Amino acid sequence: MRDHLEASPGLWLRRWSERDARAVLTAFADPLMREQAREPVTSPGDAERRLAGQHRRWRAGTAFAFAVVDEEDTVLGHVAVSAIDRRHSTGWVSYWTTRAARGGGVASGACRSLARWAFDDAGLFRLELGHRVNNPASCRVAGAAGFAVEGLQRQKLEYDGVRHDVETHARLATDPEPAEAGRPARPPAT
């Protein structure tokens, strides 16, 4: 199973390493990241524990997390497949980018590459992801990465006492590769 791959020219996915703790801490200092984090990352120890957990899950085969880096190995973001169900060959995709990397196609390129890796290397068939409906940028990432809209989960998430609806997307191993960045994928005809 590959742990380092080219996502697109100048963009790479590689396993997280302990040396990335500072980059993780810096990324989570962004208010947008803090707002959506399941667990706070406010100290070097928090960042180190987060990375150690990713390594444990990789070894166990329950989740595979990659740092998204440029040619100089600068961390631009994160992409992962988790909640892996081997019986049904499914997984859940998550991603984030640093403030400086947003809006440049980093997340969609990383998600496209992760999906192909999950199908080819991890043997999964179906990948799912979701985003709050008030996050149109994440919806564009999903579409550009070939994830078709499937539906709405009402009031699924709660942040600071406020419930949020989540739009769900999925991509199958049999779906065509996304034809063009920025264009939503269409589900195959049934």
Task: Name each model-derived stretch.
Residues M1-L32, A65, V69-T190:
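Acyl-donor (CoA/ACP) binding surface of acyl/acetyltransferases
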Residues T42-D46, H55-R57, T97-T98, R186:
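Juxtamembrane/interface motifs at transmembrane-helix termini
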Residues R56-G61, F147:
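Short loop/turn motifs at secondary-structure junctions and domain boundaries
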Residues M1, G53-H55:
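Short, P/G- and charge-enriched loop/turn segments at secondary-structure junctions
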Residues F28, A37, W58-R59:
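Hydrophobic residues in alpha-helical segments
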Residues L32-G53, F66:
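Conserved GNAT-fold acetyl-CoA-binding loop/helix
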